[in-house]
């Protein structure tokens, strides 16, 4: 599905029956979370709350609440088509030299398409139709959700944060939640290894004492939002990747108060600075783990200007115990991750992030085992190859006769092919999500790899069991006679 911006995407979702307009007044404080949570768990539509209590701006929720809508947001009609997108990213991440003239000719359209999707910079855009500065800046006028009863306050949950480090041409795009603490102040919660935080650190080193410019787009088009959470090769900008998804160049506009470029069609843009030493306690907030997180200090984002479209729409979400939108995104992203992993490890058959595992904390891998110890190599590869899996605590590796997406299969393999002492790998003092309160130290914890593959000579001295399977000829005969047996079985 191709679309121009968030509004066009909303319109097309409505035509497909994938969006519901809610005209009943609903409070952004808690009520929207409960409604979106029930809707997501039922596989329901995106929701456009047209009458948020106390506000005149509609709120869009549950946009990526199903795998299909994630695929539609990426310009595809089904989740299965995301596998092709992963193959493209795998190729761009590590392009192979052409094997000859014919191969070079066949690859030329791919490179031409990528080069043709460089973003287009315009002199003006819809996101700057209205400009608020000085005392007009009041974030309390936005219908920012308070998601859970013990949250510290309203939380901006889908901010596309745009930064640029010193001496860098490429901008960084990231999704970092922001707590509202004043009419023009938000807390920028980013982890130290994230692109935005690294840009800020480099800025402080090269420009000590100077404020760091930041812009935040709210309500960007889905391709740009999803591009910010996809493993895009370092040689490809998120804006160019968004153009590939959307099928048209990403249109950007320069901010009024800094040199950063933001999506021209965004509903809102916040422009401002991080001032050195200006920090605040963030949290607690209910998170994707299903728990409230600890209070930690993060930089304060001072908003000096708000620009927005006429009659803007505020895009929001909540995070909570899975399933939530991050968990749904994780499942859909599986299809993108598989080809990228297979490019480096061709023996991998499938890769799965169970939604119950809080988006990324557990991974199941199936593989064609080729030698003793092979499963352990794949474990290490998952942890090290893509930074998206830096925080994955548990990796289960199974043979290719196991369905990675079926817990019954996985548990069977674990309980019949594993010895806990021999087949468990424990690694201490590794990077862990700061939100993981189970780790002994914030940001530092252990990882566990589980080898649930059949064991080869060298891994065991015992005779290994052979899996039971019925004779195919017998199965065929029983299939043919089944209807005459009169045995009623549930569908």
Swiss-Prot record:
Query: What would be one Pfam family of this protein?
Result: UbiD
Reactions it catalyzes: a 4-hydroxy-3-(all-trans-polyprenyl)benzoate + H(+) = a 2-(all-trans-polyprenyl)phenol + CO2
Residues annotated as binding Mn(2+) are 172, 238
Q: Write the record's keywords in alphabetical order, separated by commas.
A: Cell membrane, Decarboxylase, Flavoprotein, FMN, Lyase, Manganese, Membrane, Metal-binding, Ubiquinone biosynthesis
Which cofactors, if any, are listed as required? prenylated FMN; Mn(2+)
Q: Which family does it belong to?
A: Belongs to the UbiD family.
* Protein name (database record): 3-octaprenyl-4-hydroxybenzoate carboxy-lyase
Q: Which organism is it from?
A: Alcanivorax borkumensis (strain ATCC 700651 / DSM 11573 / NCIMB 13689 / SK2)
Taxonomic lineage from the root: Bacteria, Pseudomonadati, Pseudomonadota, Gammaproteobacteria, Oceanospirillales
Q: Which gene encodes it?
A: ubiD
């Amino acid at each position: 599905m191709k679309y121009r911006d968030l509004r066009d995407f909303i319109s097309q979702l409505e035509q497909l029956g994938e969006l519901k307009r809610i005209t009943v007044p609903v409070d952004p404080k808690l009520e929207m979370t409960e409604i979106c949570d029930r809707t997501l768990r039922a596989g329901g539509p995106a929701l456009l709350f047209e009458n948020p209590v106390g506000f005149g701006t509609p709120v869009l929720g549950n946009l990526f609440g199903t795998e299909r809508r994630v695929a539609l947001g990426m310009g595809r009609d089904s989740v299965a088509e995301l596998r092709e997108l992963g193959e493209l990213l795998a190729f761009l991440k590590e392009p192979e030299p052409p094997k000859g003239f014919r191969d070079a000719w066949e690859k030329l359209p791919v490179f031409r398409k990528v080069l043709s999707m460089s973003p287009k910079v315009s002199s003006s855009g819809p996101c700057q139709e209205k400009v608020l500065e000085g005392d007009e800046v009041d974030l309390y006028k936005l219908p920012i959700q308070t998601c859970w009863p013990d949250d510290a306050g309203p939380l901006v949950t889908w901010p596309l944060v745009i930064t640029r480090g010193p001496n860098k041409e490429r901008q960084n795009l990231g999704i970092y939640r922001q707590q509202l603490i004043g009419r023009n102040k938000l807390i920028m919660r980013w982890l130290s290894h994230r692109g935005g935080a690294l840009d800020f650190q480099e800025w402080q080193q090269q420009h000590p004492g100077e404020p760091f410019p930041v812009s935040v787009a709210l309500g960007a088009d889905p391709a740009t939002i999803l591009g910010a959470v996809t493993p895009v090769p370092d040689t490809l900008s998120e804006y160019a990747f968004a153009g590939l998804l959307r099928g048209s160049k990403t249109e950007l506009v320069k901010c009024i108060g800094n040199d950063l470029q933001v999506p021209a069609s965004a509903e809102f843009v916040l422009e401002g600075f991080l001032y050195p030493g200006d920090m605040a306690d963030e949290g607690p907030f209910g998170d994707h783990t299903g728990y409230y997180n600890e209070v930690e200090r993060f930089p304060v984002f001072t908003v000096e200007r708000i620009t927005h479209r006429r009659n803007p729409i505020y895009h929001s979400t909540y995070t909570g115990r899975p399933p939530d939108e991050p968990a749904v995104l994780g499942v859909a992203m599986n299809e993108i991750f598989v080809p990228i992993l297979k490019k480096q490890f061709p023996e991998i058959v499938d890769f799965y992030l169970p939604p119950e595992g809080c988006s990324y904390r557990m991974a199941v891998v199936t593989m064609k085992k080729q030698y003793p110890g092979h499963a352990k190599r794949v474990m290490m590869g998952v942890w090290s190859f893509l930074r998206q899996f830096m925080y994955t605590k548990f990796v289960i590796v199974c043979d290719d006769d196991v369905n990675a997406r079926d817990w019954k299969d996985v548990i069977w393999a674990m309980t019949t092919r594993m010895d806990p002492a021999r087949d468990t790998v424990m690694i201490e003092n590794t990077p862990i999500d700061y939100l993981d309160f189970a780790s002994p130290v914030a940001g530092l914890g252990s990882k566990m790899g589980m080898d649930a593959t059949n064991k080869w000579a060298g891994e065991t001295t015992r005779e290994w069991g052979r899996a039971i399977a019925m004779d195919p000829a017998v199965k065929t005969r029983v299939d043919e006679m089944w209807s005459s047996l009169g045995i009623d079985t549930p569908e």
